[in-house]
């Protein structure tokens, strides 16, 4: 049962009891994931028990079991507690800054600011996994806090053809809105995992694709390719769902609409000399988060709003009468009335935010496609989807021009999906990055498990091969890498994310092999045996 009473978004403010826990929403009309219309609904938490579902290829050694209120929660790849608004200065700052950025990125959702971006692979994508921040203190060096986007610098040339990519300069406000809706996967949609089956179908239909399993061997028939790719993708998405929803169910973490409105009710956390100071309030940021003063258009007829917090962001559904013709635009609104860029009949998914399911699903799918096709890149080095002018957007009118979403690699598409949830207003970055890390691990592990079914020796003694498992993952930099169910004859090689081999020694004892290494730097590594590849996260 939820700790907090439901929030009714059409009313201002939020007086929830616990700002660290999920809050249901009460809507006049709710359209669920399947497109069903429910009148005056308060949707329950969807799938809180999913960590207890039988997995496809998840390793029980990566599972932690928790209990609360007599219920059992199985959590795979436990990322630990997200920052809480609890009076601790460090965690309060992490919480406040993360959710404040969601409102700030809402200011990018209008074409009227005239800001132009090149959204081709020339300028976006190609994010190094080594640049992924592992500590919250490093997040602001990865995300562009005020302008939007991440640290990706794009490609100097197409990695497949070696030709330059054609630039695509568009209005940022068109791009961000298209991105938010393209990856929304909300009501009446194929859902996030289904979205990656759509991408898989398009990849499989691309005439530039050579249908070789893992990029080598004989060309597969269309039927064999489809069966194997669907089997693998289905297993990977199943495990990603179990992992993400096990975490969601246990940590039961708050969503932006609840957190932003709650902090707005408390006041501001920047200037202790002002009467509206509260250490748990929103930060004051010129041009983005300010105080309503006398003479302000938001002051109210009786100046009842003086001293309240206002935000410069997407203005919400009060400014849209006809979504086929109207745009809410960006402007100053009371923070207590903040809305995410979503449908008013959906507003925010009815389950906890941490970790981002989109980030987990997408990264797992990208890793699986990379291994299955034998290449990290879309066929021909380009995946492309077109959002037509004044046709594509559903939440409001637009875009004002054709927008081509373009990606060189599967990981580029995954990274873009993760960013879209911040612009869409349903995830802060503290939900995003752990989902990416976990998805990258699940995608590889579950692929390896499924790929073992394609071995010609599956029904012989070699069936033991898929049982090789990492004793723990992630590990710390000075911790040995240990593999269980070994026989002492395996050959292991360790590589960093750049492909450089790391010198190691091995020690075998009673069906357990220890990989001995010099202290590893934080980052992602690949451990390979004759038959299996693991992606290892070093903290």
What are the functions of these language-model segments?
Residues 1-457:
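Acidic/polar surface patches and capping/hinge elements
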Residues 461-539:
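C-terminal outer-membrane/trafficking sorting elements
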């Amino acid at each position: 049962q939820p700790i907090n009473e439901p929030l009714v978004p059409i009313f201002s403010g939020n007086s929830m009891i616990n700002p660290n826990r999920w809050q249901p929403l009460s809507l006049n009309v709710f359209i669920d994931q399947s497109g069903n219309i429910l009148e005056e609904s308060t949707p329950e938490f969807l799938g809180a028990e999913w960590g207890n579902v039988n997995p496809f290829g998840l390793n029980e050694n990566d599972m932690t079991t928790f209990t609360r209120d007599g219920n059992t929660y199985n959590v795979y790849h436990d990322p630990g507690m997200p920052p809480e608004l609890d009076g601790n200065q460090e965690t309060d700052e992490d919480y406040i800054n993360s959710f404040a950025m969601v409102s700030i990125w809402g200011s990018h959702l209008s074409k009227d600011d005239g800001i132009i971006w090149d959204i081709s692979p020339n300028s976006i994508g190609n994010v190094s996994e080594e640049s992924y921040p592992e500590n919250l203190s490093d997040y602001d060096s990865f995300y562009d806090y005020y302008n939007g986007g991440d640290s990706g610098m794009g490609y100097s040339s197409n990695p497949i053809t070696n030709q330059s990519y054609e630039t695509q300069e568009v209005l940022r406000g068109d791009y961000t809105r298209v991105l938010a809706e393209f990856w929304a996967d909300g009501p009446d949609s194929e859902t996030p995992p289904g979205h990656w089956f759509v991408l898989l179908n398009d990849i499989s239909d691309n005439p530039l694709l050579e249908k070789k399993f893992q990029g080598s061997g004989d060309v597969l028939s269309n039927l064999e390719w489809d069966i194997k790719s669907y089997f693998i993708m289905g297993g990977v998405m199943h495990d990603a769902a179990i992992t993400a929803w096990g975490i969601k169910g246990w940590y039961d973490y708050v969503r932006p609409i609840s957190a932003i409105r709650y902090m707005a009710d408390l006041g501001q956390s920047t200037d202790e000399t002002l009467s509206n100071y509260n250490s748990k309030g929103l930060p004051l940021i010129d041009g983005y988060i300010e105080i309503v003063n006398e003479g302000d258009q938001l002051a109210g007829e009786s100046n009842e709003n003086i001293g309240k917090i206002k935000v410069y962001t997407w203005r919400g559904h009060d400014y849209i009468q006809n979504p086929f013709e109207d745009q809410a635009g960006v402007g100053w609104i009371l923070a207590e009335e903040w809305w995410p860029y979503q449908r008013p009949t959906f507003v925010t998914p009815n389950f906890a935010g941490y970790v981002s399911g989109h980030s987990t699903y997408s990264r797992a799918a990208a890793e699986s496609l990379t291994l299955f096709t034998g290449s990290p890149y879309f066929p021909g080095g380009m995946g492309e989807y077109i959002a037509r002018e004044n046709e594509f957007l559903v939440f409001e009118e637009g875009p004002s021009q054709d927008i081509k979403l373009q990606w060189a690699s599967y990981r580029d598409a995954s990274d873009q999906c993760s960013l879209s949830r911040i612009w869409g207003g349903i995830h802060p970055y503290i939900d995003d990055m752990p989902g990416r890390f976990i998805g990258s691990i699940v995608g590889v592990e579950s692929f390896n498990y499924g790929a073992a079914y394609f071995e010609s020796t599956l029904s012989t003694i070699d069936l033991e091969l898929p049982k090789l498992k990492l004793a723990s993952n992630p590990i710390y930099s000075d911790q040995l890498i240990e593999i269980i169910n070994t026989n002492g004859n395996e050959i292991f090689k360790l590589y960093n994310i750049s492909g450089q081999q790391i010198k190691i020694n091995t020690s075998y004892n009673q069906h357990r092999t220890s990989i001995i290494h010099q202290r590893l730097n934080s980052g992602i590594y690949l451990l390979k045996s004759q038959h299996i590849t693991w992606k290892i996260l070093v903290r």
